[in-house]
Every structure is written in structure tokens, then in C-alpha cells.
A protein has these predicted regions:
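Phosphate-handling catalytic cores of nucleic-acid transaction enzymes
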Residues: 1-559
Length: 559
């Protein structure tokens, strides 16, 4: 994806490396990468789940310190809304505890301090009530005696005493578990206005009764003011608050919510603000091993504590992007705009696509703040932005798969790939046969014999086709002139994935990637997934070997 966006650009800035599942790596010696690697290795959890927990902790620590100015000049908060969908047994709580240790400890200290302060406030308030009664009796006595001067003085004493009423102590608590949006807003108002909703079972947020209150969470994500009108208690306005959501939920909770209220939640824009990950399952694939000293955990949480306890001014620091990062940001923006057009990946997901680059910018700002060595460094570099763009694009893929209906272009491309594979398998041969070859010359879907392959690798089937042939006998939704644009878009996507190549008036299709050098513009399984075809990570590039008649190109791994 980065290669496609940067095509024909003059700079040669490094791109983040990817793991086997297509998730990006940050800088090798960064606190983030070290802690994520240690957590994934020691707890035997997926890297993507470890990254989501780490980013939740980082956003919680940074949201009160910095905002980010996007290249358009628009200033936005750095709060994040993160959702990890994982089954029971995937060690969600263990992973959360690893990255949120410092946050939990600071929150516990704040809670204990507040309890002691509340106890003292109750004593002070009771003494205040006693003194108030004494002053009121003195006032009544003066008023009864008709001493105007004494009455006025007693009244002033009562008024001054009322103004000095001991108020409830504002708590430093900022970490909240499963609760409703209404209660959350109230606690942010009564406590410090920077908080994190952390839960491994987000049932309250994804319950039907909370749906009418989700607009409050939208407003907090936007950085706006939340107005709360109440009859039984004083109304209030929550201003300049920041809230990060680091939620984990089981698939059945999300599926139930989506089936009952998903369309409404999409309509409010609530789901579009989330970065979503459904980690690969690790339960049943773990080995017995003893935990190490977890030294990376200590370094990570020490940095989190530094950020949360640092002196902050009333004005948040505003981060900006470097010039190269700005150029890359605008190219990402153009890519998203193009994909929101008809037949684009995000044509039916404009709500989600419109938030992707802002989420990328927020993520880049928090990563920069967490890793920087000097607080005066306010410029986000292009590598950090590229890492965050790769991460949010992977999250986008998970959003499409688990919180949204499949885009039309993905459905069409799967249908076309299925159709072509069916033809190719029907015509497939493993060695040249003159008689068969003669008969196949009259077949419109021609296929070449497969060459010799290295062990444990296959090239897959291939065939050729023309537009008119697919329009006549292909999938019904891609037939005819009326559906030409949909067919062209599906072919274009297969071309970018490397499975289709134009050869004059015909197109060549192969089950494996057709390229003999380099990588495709898009990698199957990264950002988008065409389930009919092997994933990019399920293929291997083979160098030419004349002694064994191997030709350079991609082969499918035999699992």
C-alpha cells in the first residue's frame, strides 16, 4: 500500500518492515517495539493484540499533553478509540495488565488519596454545618433584638460562611471500567477531565440501552463540549476533556450488537471512529515456557509514568508533521478520496474512510510523543507516519470484515476470481500433451502447461480471458454493458494484487502472483482480502534456477 502511494516520488525514505501477517514493525530500538515483542513472545499472544494494548496505554498518557495539527491546518485531539475482538482464552487481561501497569498503579494511588481526602472533607463539612447553625442562631438573636447594626454584621458572617462551604475533593482518578457513556461523562466532570475506559468485556458500551448516549463519546473524540441537562441534579458542561477507549470484547458480544443495533451505530458515526483488530487466535498453539524478567515491560511503564506525572500547562502542545510527512499525508488523502468514488474500496464506507487519516494522525502524534527524547521536538517524521498508516490500514481491513458489510468491489473481485479459477482448474494439465493442446486452441479460456516447481511449492493454475468472454459467461453481476465499470474495477484490483496481467487484447490470470520481479502494488491479506486467492504471506518468491528449469516468480506454499 505504501509502495502504491509513493510510486514515482523522488524521496527514498525507509518503509516499516512487516511481520508475516502484514502488521508493521516500528523502530527496532524503540520502547514500543521492544515491549510489544516481549509481550507477544513471553505471553504467547499475537503481536497485533499486544500493539493495540500498548497504543491504548500510550494514548492515555499522551492525550492530556498534546494535540496534533494535520497538514490541512485542522487541530485535533490525540485520543483514540480502540476495539480488540477476541475469544475467551486469548489472554486479553494478561496483555492489558502488561501495558497498563503504571496507569493502574497511578490510578490506585489517586483513588486511595481521594478516599482519605473525602474522609477529611466530611469532617470539615460537618464542622462547617455546626458553625453555620451557630451563626444562624446569632443572626436570629440579633434580628429579634432589633439591633440593626448587629443584625447586618451577623448576616454578613452567615454569607461569608456559606461562601466558604467545603467542596467535594476532585479525584485524580482517570481509569474507568465497564460503564455507560452517561456515567463516564459525569465522572470526567467530577474528576480530572482526562480519562481512559479500559475493559476486557465491553458489554455496557455495546448494549442496546447505551446506544442513545453514544453521541457523547463521539463529541469527546472530536474534542467538543458535552452538555448534560438534568432535572434532579445540577446541569453541567464538560469542556476540553479527553477520553481514550481501550476496549476488548468477545465476538458474540459484537455480533449481537451488530445484528441488533449495528446500522444505528454506523449511522451515528460511532463505529467509524474505532480502530478495530480481530487478532489471530493463539489458544491451542502455545508451548510451555517460563516467563523472563520482563525488562521491556519496566521500561515501557516507566515512560508511561513519566508522561502521566509530568508537569503540564493549561495549553496542550501542538505537534506538526515534517515536510516529507506532509507530502505523504496528502498522498494518503488522495488515495482515500479515490477509493471513496464509485467502485472504490470505500464507496460504501465513506463514514469509516473519512476518519482513517485523522486516526492515523492521532496515532502518529502519540507515538512521536511517547518515543521522543526531547519535549521541544514537535515534528512528526515520515517514518512514524508510514508506520501509523500501515497500522490503520490493517485496522481498516478488520473493520470491513467484522463491523461493516463487504464492499461491492471485494465481492465482485471474489466472484471474478472464483469464476476464473473454476475455468483454470477445469483446463489444468501438468505436462504438455499435443492432442490436448490442439483441442484447447479452440477454447476461449486458454491455459499454458505448468512448469517444473521446487518442492513444497506450486505455481497454481492459470488461464487467459477477454472482456467479452467474461461479459457473456462470467458472474451475472459482471455481465453486460451496464456492469462494465464493476468488471473493470474487479480486473483492476486483481491487477494491483498481481494476479492479472494484460497481454494485448487478452488478460492473463494466475492463481499465484504473476510478477517475475518485485512486489505487487497491493498484497492480498494486507488491507484487503480476496478469499478466493492465496494470501501474499502464503506465497514465496523463487529465483531463477537454470539447472532445475525454475523461472523467477511467486509460488504458493503447500501447507
Amino acid at each position: 500500500m505504501i509502495e502504491e502511494i509513493e510510486k514515482n516520488q523522488p524521496w527514498t525514505s525507509p518503509n516499516p518492515s512487516m511481520d508475516e501477517q502484514g502488521w508493521p514493525h516500528f523502530s527496532e530500538h524503540s520502547l514500543f517495539e521492544a515491549a510489544v515483542g516481549e509481550s507477544a513472545r513471553e505471553h504467547q499472544v499475537s503481536r497485533e493484540m499486544a500493539m493495540m494494548c500498548a497504543l491504548g496505554a500510550i494514548a492515555t498518557a499522551c492525550q492530556g499533553l498534546v494535540d496534533v495539527e494535520m497538514p490541512t491546518g485542522h487541530r485535533v485531539p490525540t485520543s483514540l478509540m480502540l476495539l480488540t475482538i477476541a475469544e475467551s482464552g486469548e489472554r486479553k487481561t494478561v496483555t492489558q495488565n502488561y501495558f497498563f501497569e503504571a496507569i493502574t498503579n497511578l490510578n490506585d494511588v489517586a483513588h486511595r488519596t481521594n478516599e482519605a481526602a473525602l474522609l477529611q472533607q466530611k469532617v470539615d463539612h460537618q464542622l462547617w454545618i455546626t458553625q453555620k447553625k451557630h451563626l444562624e442562631r446569632a443572626f436570629n438573636k440579633c434580628a429579634t433584638q432589633g439591633d440593626e447594626a448587629a443584625t447586618h454584621a451577623a448576616l454578613e458572617a452567615v454569607a461569608e460562611h456559606l461562601r466558604a462551604e467545603p467542596q467535594p475533593v476532585r479525584s485524580g482518578k482517570f481509569l474507568y471500567e465497564d460503564t455507560t457513556p452517561q456515567a463516564l461523562v459525569h465522572m470526567l466532570y467530577e474528576n480530572i477531565p482526562h480519562g481512559c475506559l479500559l475493559t476486557s468485556e465491553a458489554s455496557s458500551i455495546f448494549s442496546g440501552k447505551a446506544l442513545g448516549e453514544l453521541d457523547k463519546l463521539n463529541t469527546l473524540w472530536d474534542g467538543g463540549s458535552v452538555k448534560v441537562d438534568r432535572i434532579s441534579r445540577d446541569s453541567f458542561v464538560l469542556q476540553n476533556a479527553r477520553l481514550t477507549l481501550s476496549l476488548m470484547a468477545q465476538p458474540n458480544v459484537i455480533n449481537r450488537f451488530m445484528s441488533k443495533r449495528g446500522e444505528e451505530a454506523r449511522g451515528t458515526g460511532f463505529l467509524a471512529r474505532f480502530l478495530v483488530v480481530k487478532p489471530r487466535t493463539m489458544a491451542g498453539h502455545r508451548t510451555n515456557q517460563k516467563l523472563s524478567k520482563l525488562s521491556r515491560k519496566k521500561a515501557f511503564n516507566t515512560r508511561i509514568q513519566e508522561l502521566l506525572t509530568s508537569e503540564s500547562s493549561s495549553e496542550r502542545q501542538v505537534l506538526q508533521f515534517s515536510e516529507q510527512a506532509k507530502d505523504f499525508w496528502f498522498m494518503c488523502n488522495q488515495y482515500l478520496e479515490k477509493q471513496m468514488q464509485e467502485n472504490g474500496l470505500y464507496y460504501y464506507l465513506k463514514d469509516h474512510a473519512s476518519k482513517l487519516l485523522e486516526n492515523t494522525s492521532r496515532l502518529a502524534a502519540t507515538m512521536h510523543t511517547f518515543e521522543r527524547k526531547n519535549n521541544s521536538d514537535i515534528e512528526i517524521d515520515i517514518f512514524t507516519l508510514k508506520f501509523c498508516w500501515s497500522f490503520t490500514q490493517n485496522c481498516s481491513k478488520h473493520f470491513i470484515e467484522h463491523l461493516a458489510n463487504e464492499p461491492q468491489i471485494i465481492t465482485d473481485t471474489n466472484l471474478l476470481a472464483h469464476f476464473l479459477l473454476k475455468i483454470a482448474y477445469k483446463l489444468d494439465i501438468h505436462s504438455p500433451d499435443p492432442e490436448t493442446e490442439t483441442n484447447r486452441k479452440s477454447d476461449p479460456f486458454r491455459i499454458k502447461a505448468r512448469p517444473v516447481q521446487p518442492g513444497d511449492l506450486i505455481i497454481g493454475v492459470e488461464t487467459t480471458f477477454t472482456l467479452s468472454q467474461v461479459k457473456q459467461s462470467g458472474p451475472s453481476v459482471l455481465r453486460g454493458r451496464a456492469n462494465s465499470e464493476r468488471l473493470y474495477s474487479a480486473i483492476d484490483l486483481l491487477t494491483k494484487l498481481g494476479h492479472v496481467k494484460r497481454e494485448r487484447s487478452r488478460f492473463r490470470f494466475r492463481e499465484s502472483i504473476l510478477l517475475s520481479t518485485g512486489e505487487p502494488e497491493l498484497k492480498n491479506g494486507q488491507i484487503i482480502t480476496i478469499k478466493e486467492l492465496p494470501l501474499f504471506c502464503e506465497q514465496e518468491f523463487v529465483q531463477e534456477n537454470n539447472s532445475n528449469c525454475y523461472t523467477s516468480g511467486y509460488r504458493i506454499k503447500i501447507i
